[in-house]
Regions:
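A charged N-terminal "starter" segment
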Residues: 1-131, 410-414
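Conserved, mostly hydrophobic/aromatic
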Residues: 53, 76, 106, 169, ...
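Flexible, glycine/charged-enriched surface loops at secondary-structure junctions
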Residues: 69-70, 232-240, 391-394
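Active-site-proximal beta-alpha core segment in soluble small-molecule metabolic enzymes
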Residues: 72-214
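Active-site loop/helix belt of alpha/beta enzymes
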Residues: 166, 172-290
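Active-site loop ensemble at the mouth of alpha/beta enzyme cores that anchors a bound cofactor
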Residues: 249-340
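C-terminal accessory subdomain/extension
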Residues: 311-414
């Protein structure tokens, strides 16, 4: 059977027979690595192109190194420990997560540098955070805080386990997500954290919700100024300053170029690893600054045509359960008339085969003049828009080489 990377769960659960596979997994009877993705395929499947993963990992780590940044890629994008291993081997500081549960997944798979990029109020979660250095004195696990209530909850948990909670004060902007809305509030939360015995490490924010890179750059500069005012409350020799969605991180780099020498900038971008054919393809900073590098889309979803009920319409057995749709519909990258590994793949002329609509389990294709003729049984290969809501549809994702042969299977932990 094909090796599943980063998965120590039982192969079967709940008494189901071994022939019932986890979503995305190859057929248990399929050959090990080396078979074509369509051999013994249970479509739809999601694949990751290994060469694109390697390329994107190297490009982003080189970018961070070139600009003197620490990189803590957001694990919530893929929740795949095997992909985290790649990022860490390339030089990432650790990982970012959105919740304590996600932090537990990272920790259980050996990653002990973790930033929980949210305020944590759950007592059990805070107690777990506070006890990490007892488990591993070299661990570095932090979370955000943006309220006195959050400070008090963390302090109670810290006392309950005789541990330590390390925090970053989160600063936001009006109409945005979490984070205090003023310098005065930031000072108050920072002072409360220190007075409560928490370990204040620095300041954090999220610029990804701002409308453009120029606005993001100006806002980050303002947050950096507040961080400088709070710096005397940070006892450590070096303070942390964390930012980083996947759309405006070039603005972050500009804004922190003249930062104090004792400040480490921790970038949290996550979507770069797999990139996409839609939302981030349009917004990536590498598109604005091609001299810094370029990313390649790694994700493809393979589905089979099940019906061609009328001229100009084809239905594929791929739907909202299989692809992201919150930031744009999938795009058709290729079709394979005949639908087997031996049939040649065809790239349709631009605009001739498009996704018009998604239902839970159906994709409506619109076909115009010049589109290749589709019949039931043909295979369509889709690119996606927004990787952060693509991975959660799958429990296993197949790694493929550039000739579409399977090289392994990666497990996700949502």
């Amino acid at each position: 059977m094909t090796t599943t990377l980063g998965d120590d769960r039982p192969a079967t659960t709940g008494g189901l027979p071994g022939t019932v596979t986890t979503k995305g997994a190859p057929d248990p009877a399929a050959a090990a690595a080396g078979r074509h993705v369509l051999d013994h395929a249970h479509l739809p499947v999601m694949t990751l192109r290994d060469s694109a993963l390697e390329h994107n990992t190297a490009v982003m780590q080189a970018y961070a190194d070139r600009h003197g940044l620490l990189l803590a890629p957001h694990m919530k994008t893929h929740m795949a420990p095997a992909l985290v291993d790649r990022q860490l081997r390339a030089g990432a500081w650790g990982v970012t997560v959105a919740s304590v549960q996600q932090a537990m997944v990272a920790w259980a798979h050996g990653t002990h540098r973790v930033l929980v990029a949210n305020e944590v109020l759950d007592p059990a979660g805070l107690a777990w955070l506070a006890s990490r250095r007892t488990e591993d004195p070299a661990a570095d696990v932090l979370c955000n805080v943006d309220s006195v209530a959050g400070v008090e909850a963390a302090a109670r948990a810290q006392r309950s386990v005789d541990g330590a909670v390390h925090v970053l004060v989160e600063i936001g902007f009006p109409g945005g997500r979490t984070g205090v809305r003023s310098a005065e509030q930031a000072h108050a939360v920072a002072r409360a954290a220190v007075d409560a015995g928490l370990t204040l490490r620095g300041v954090t924010g999220y610029e990804g919700g701002l409308p453009d890179v120029d606005t993001a750059r100006d806002w980050v500069r303002g947050v950096l100024a507040v961080a400088a005012e709070i710096r005397p409350l940070v006892a450590a020799e070096r303070a942390l300053f964390s930012m980083g969605g996947s759309a405006w991180f070039d603005g972050v780099v500009d804004a922190v170029a003249d930062r104090p020498a004792d400040v480490d900038v921790l970038l949290r971008s996550g979507a770069y690893l797999t990139h996409d054919d839609g939302f981030y393809a349009e917004r990536t900073p590498f598109r604005r600054r091609p001299e810094e590098g370029a990313l390649r889309p790694a994700i493809e979803v393979w589905g089979r045509v099940t019906s061609c009920p009328e001229p100009g319409r084809a239905l594929v057995a791929v739907g909202k359960r299989d692809v992201s749709f919150d930031e744009g519909l999938p795009v058709v990258r290729a079709v394979r008339p005949g639908g087997t590994a031996q049939d040649p793949q065809v790239v349709p002329p631009p605009g001739t085969v498009t996704v018009a609509r998604l239902d839970d389990q159906h994709c409506y294709l619109a076909l115009t003049d010049g589109a290749p003729g589709l019949t039931p049984g043909d295979v369509v290969v889709f690119g996606i828009s927004h990787p952060c809501t693509a991975f959660d549809k799958w429990r296993q994702v197949q790694l493929v080489a550039d000739d579409d042969t399977v090289t392994g299977t990666i497990a996700t932990w949502f």
